[in-house]
Amino acid sequence: VAATGAQSLAAGLGVADEGGNAIDAALAAAFVALATEPGLVSFGGGAFINIWPAESEPVVIDGNVEMPGRGLPHDRFGAGVREIWTDYGGGVLMHAGHGTAATPGCVPALARAHADYAKLSWPRLLEPAIFAARDGYPMGAAGARYLNFVADSLFGDDPEAHRLVTRGDGSLIEPGEVTANPLLADTLIALANE
């Protein structure tokens, strides 16, 4: 199992030890990464999933985001977009705000991979992510580094979002510091029960 952090790895290994297949392990690890790496990956984003079944050709599940209103004249979109410059990665210009929101494709792609290739139940694969979001997880070094650049500029306009990526006093979460997202846990419980 390849994973981005200890909790993701444990989730993947745990379902593999229970008899899950490679897709089960990858999905469990991905769910935990999505729940514990704020800013780096998101359930609200896109995903491309590459699967090569043993007895057939490789498959790519396209879970890219869709832009609502694509094809409409530019003047139909209105305002709500702000430009944010960050020094992260050598310098990146981002666009943020409600005018930049896309329809997420990540969860539908994960659901398709589960329906077509997984062995264990959907709720079982979400359990480790629910636990991590509800009970806490150590902030990874990569996530803390990214949030150091964007916690205020990207998340600062929305007090609720800002609280999710900083401490209660607004200061930055350090690598290894335990944080949680109970509202995400509630959402994942609902997703598990769908």
What are the roles of these predicted feature ranges?
Residues 1-10, 14, 22-194:
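Noncatalytic scaffold domains of N-terminal-nucleophile
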